[in-house]
Amino acid sequence: MSKVYDWFEERLEIQAIADDITSKYVPPHVNIFYCLGGITLTCFLVQVATGFAMTFYYRPTVTEAFASVQYIMTEANFGWLIRSVHRWSASMMVLMMILHVFRVYLTGGFKKPRELTWVTGVVLAVLTASFGVTGYSLPWDQVGYWAVKIVTGVPDAIPVIGSPLVELLRGSASVGQSTLTRFYSLHTFVLPLLTAVFMLMHFLMIRKQGISGPL
């Protein structure tokens, strides 16, 4: 085993990377409230795992979506547990994200030179809210349907570009299969990819600049 490790160490300098990760200076003022961002990340990873598991059973069609969710909850092995964890982890992610934003704002973590870290955090907050909007509609029950209809109808109040925006969101003039397909694609592919990219940027900047000092 040591020979295998030495082979990789010679080429990749694994020990140097490990030392850099584990030896980062942590300011003495850091407390449990500085863990809120990490908890948000953990919730996101739980969302990815449980969401991926549900894609094996969920059917993104207006005629089968609700029945497939019922199947997950009543027939699939541990489906009720996976969906419940997904749901509660989603709520926890939103709550931890809000508390994290408040902590950063109240401790001045958005000030120079960490403006870009704050910007990426704001983008992540918008993406988190978008997860909630798109995921809420996927069961395609009465609550999900009318939520989509209301949310996608909001841009209609914007002059000139309002109607085209509504049609872009819905995929057609009215809420239907095209809308569900778009929301499913956003929820399972586009938003997770964007979130992963911005999280990586966010953490790299934190890694480079370190944790902000006390006020």
UniProtKB/Swiss-Prot annotation:
Residues at which heme b 2 binds: 86, 187
Cofactor(s) needed: heme b; heme c
Location, primary (coarse class): plastid
Entry binding sites for heme b 1: 100, 202
Cofactor note: Binds 2 heme b groups non-covalently with two histidine residues as axial ligands. Binds one heme group covalently by a single cysteine link with no axial amino acid ligand. This heme was named heme ci.
Bilayer topology: Multi-pass membrane protein
GO molecular function: electron transporter, transferring electrons within cytochrome b6/f complex of photosystem II activity; metal ion binding; oxidoreductase activity
Gene3D superfamilies registered for this protein in UniProt: Cytochrome Bc1 Complex, Chain C (1.20.810.10)
Transmembrane intervals: 32-52, 90-110, 116-136, 186-206
GO biological process: photosynthesis; respiratory electron transport chain
Pfam families linked: Cytochrome_B
Protein residues bound to heme c: 35
InterPro entries per record: Cyt_b/b6_N, Cyt_B6_PetB, Cytb/b6-like_sf, Cytochrome_b_N_euk/bac, Di-haem_cyt_TM
Keyword terms of this UniProt record: Chloroplast, Electron transport, Heme, Iron, Membrane, Metal-binding, Photosynthesis, Plastid, Thylakoid, Transmembrane, Transmembrane helix, Transport
GO cellular component entries: chloroplast thylakoid membrane
Compartments it resides in: Plastid, Chloroplast thylakoid membrane
Further remarks about this protein from its record: Heme 1 (or BH or b566) is high-potential and absorbs at about 566 nm, and heme 2 (or BL or b562) is low-potential and absorbs at about 562 nm.
Family: Belongs to the cytochrome b family. PetB subfamily.
Subunit structure: The 4 large subunits of the cytochrome b6-f complex are cytochrome b6, subunit IV (17 kDa polypeptide, PetD), cytochrome f and the Rieske protein, while the 4 small subunits are PetG, PetL, PetM and PetN. The complex functions as a dimer.
Family matches, as NCBIfam families: PRK03735.1 (NF002990)
Function: Component of the cytochrome b6-f complex, which mediates electron transfer between photosystem II (PSII) and photosystem I (PSI), cyclic electron flow around PSI, and state transitions.
Protein name stated in the entry: Cytochrome b6
Species name: Nicotiana tabacum (Common tobacco)
Gene name of the record: petB
